[in-house]
Amino acid sequence: MSDLNTLTLAQARDALRKGETTSVALTEACLAAIEGAGALNAFVHKTPELALERAKAADERLQGREEAPKMCGLPIGIKDLFCTKGVPSQAASRILEGFKPEYESTVSQQLADAGAVMLGKLNMDEFAMGSSNETSCYGNAVNPWRRGNDDAALTPGGSSGGSAAAVAADLCLAATGTDTGGSIRQPAAFVGITGIKPTYGRCSRWGIVAFASSLDQAGPMTKDVRDAAIMLEAMCGHDPKDSTSAELAVPDFEAMLTGDIRGKVIGIPREYRMDGMPEEIEALWQQGTEMLRAAGAEIRDISLPHTKYALPTYYVIAPAEASSNLARYDGVRYGHRAKLAQGDGITEMYEKTRAEGFGHEVQRRVMVGTYVLSAGFYDAYYNRARKVRSLIKKDFEDVFAAGVDAILTPATPSAAFGLGEMTDADPVQMYLNDVFTVTVNLAGLPGVSVPAGLDKQGLPLGLQLIGRPWEEGDLLNTAYALEQAAGFVAKPSKWW
């Protein structure tokens, strides 16, 4: 078989079962692709020896008598936000320089237990704060796609930009991501792959470096919807180490992919029609609506009245939680510690370490969070944002109670933009990238981004489906129907 790294998880799994290839061969193909893709800066820590060791173990397991798990022998990348035992886990921040955890995150452990092969750690925005992968201490990851005849480097999105770039460029068969306000779905849309953020509590957060604890959720980033179903099943499950982890059975998501959505009710929220939205995004949304109607779904106009408050609500709650979570990084026990001048005490050590260790965007969000939690502003900002969050959640509950099965929206307000294009812009311009995705996190719902077309410059555009809580199987089936109808098969032309 040629170009093993271009296979989907499902194709590779079937090839392994039939004896047409081996996990070692798959892993070597991916490692070779990674070595040749330095220009993308997707992988920031490579683990070739560990990968080949796991691949050999997977091959032995596949030849054993017992049925091996679906993910057995499949090479994947792990976002740098996941703690991986003995492997650098920095959350793309200088403050965690040299940190090698003594433990493994629950999600990466479950994938390892299922036989998945970790190729290394993937680039991301620092502490998952960003929408362009430009806040990383490793430098930005680069989108494998290019505009028409233009050689300008584009963002792969963020914060899971390295994961997105690696999957789109066939450096790995799939990757883990995390999503706090759109960090799986926005990059997936920017590079033409599938990304699902499951219901809050479906995947354990234990061992994932925290950004905003009430919003963070891990999920898979894959080449298609079937792969997302396969990988999500391996990532899910109750974890007693995470108090927010749901004690629910994990269904066989792949078995639910029938593509039959006849009789399903799809909601189209009028509040997502924004001023200044590019015509191409509007047209794609309309096409997606017609595709689902043609597949037998009933299309219903719906209202989510508090949508306009979602972005400001998110950018109060997320920084507030981040300022609390990031207080633990002080240079005392691990990570970066600033060099001190004579006479400097503990306070100076904290101040200098944090000033050197945190990048500008992280510092901005910590300051915003500290401000909204301060005595004079707690009620005016933080408490008010929490109340609005509950109203946003109720909007969705009302719509689902009225019989809607899933909601179709654009995934992003534009295609991928150029690296550096927003450097001098108002930070709010960057935050607007999350305008269609943050509501899903605030309400704790599952959301999936599916590639559905190209813009006039040849860049991928995605559509988002939002589902009922805990019904990822149903949501993925609707996404599968959309994927089949859209027929998106475009790949980036190799320039790296």
From Swiss-Prot:
Classification via InterPro entries: Amidase, Amidase_CS, Amidase_dom, AS_sf, GatA
Active site: residue positions: K79, S159, S183
Record-level GO cellular component terms: glutamyl-tRNA(Gln) amidotransferase complex
Alphabetical list of SUPFAM superfamilies matching this protein: Amidase signature (AS) enzymes
Gene Ontology molecular function: ATP binding; glutaminyl-tRNA synthase (glutamine-hydrolyzing) activity
GO biological process: translation
Assigned keywords, A-Z: ATP-binding, Ligase, Nucleotide-binding, Protein biosynthesis
Catalytic activity entry: L-glutamyl-tRNA(Gln) + L-glutamine + ATP + H2O = L-glutaminyl-tRNA(Gln) + L-glutamate + ADP + phosphate + H(+)
Position of the signal peptide: none
EC number: 6.3.5.7
Family: Belongs to the amidase family. GatA subfamily.
PANTHER family per record: GLUTAMYL-TRNA(GLN) AMIDOTRANSFERASE SUBUNIT A, TRANSAMIDASE
Known role: Allows the formation of correctly charged Gln-tRNA(Gln) through the transamidation of misacylated Glu-tRNA(Gln) in organisms which lack glutaminyl-tRNA synthetase. The reaction takes place in the presence of glutamine and ATP through an activated gamma-phospho-Glu-tRNA(Gln).
Subunit record text: Heterotrimer of A, B and C subunits.
Name of the molecule in the record: Glutamyl-tRNA(Gln) amidotransferase subunit A
Lineage start: Bacteria, Pseudomonadati, Pseudomonadota, Alphaproteobacteria, Rhodobacterales
Gene: gatA
